[in-house]
Amino acid sequence: GQRFVFRALGYVTMAKAGLTEVELEDILSLDNIVLGDVIVPTYLKNPLRISHDLVAKLREELEGYLVERQVRNITLMVWANRHLHLIAQKLYLSNEEDVHQMHSLLAEYFLGAWSGGRKKIFTYDNNHFTSLNISHHKNPHHQQSHEKTSSDKYSYDRQTPEQPWVFQCNLLEPDIFFVNHRKMTELVYHLTRSGRTDDLMFGVIMNFSWLYTMIKIGQFDKALTDIDLAYSCTQEKELKFLATTLRCIKVKVLKNPASLSAELQQRLLPVVTSLPKLRH
């Protein structure tokens, strides 16, 4: 359907570094507008996902326009050139409300908000399905008639993955890990553009795991840039204090990242009464 194509190509276009085929399939499975366009209502069941064939067919039809780019051994789908990217922006990302909603959904995906079996509500419009001459789905646990309602709401598992900052093979060896570079690349970008300031503050900037990982992979200055960006979005005084503190301890923690926790506690604990959000 048209909405499937517009959303799919919109997500590829707005992603900071492109998307993998699996990521696109996951994200489209979270998008109720897409599901309402491609899922036959009598097929609604757990888990609720779009067919992999739809994404594969779309890629096949756009061969030469969508190309593969290897980034840290991950294969990402991107437009073949900047001209195509600009055209796609005009075609698929012209509606501000849709763009805001799509950035928010991408942020939820990279936050892992719907992973681990957490179910997301799916609302479908019976009138839309009636116009397609399709009888609407009845939940087996709710046998009462829904004929008088214009829409029904049920929750379904979309089977999207957990999104930790790092993947550890052995919990007994915490220094051996693989960084979730996709989350590192995309999350802050989509949180800022969707205006999800609480998630930006407490899910990222005030998250010790994020800061520690950034330092471990040599991205201390990038972490400071992200904190400054978050401050410009929120004007929260705690963020300004955190950035100042990190600049003061930069030499120490770069020399010994394991000292980060002690250094932060030493400087932040005395001021949590006046800066309460630092407790996070």
Regions found by a protein language model. Give the residues of each.
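Accessory beta->alpha helical hairpin/"wing" motif in late/C-terminal subdomains of nucleic-acid enzymes
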Residues: V22, R69-L86, V204-K222
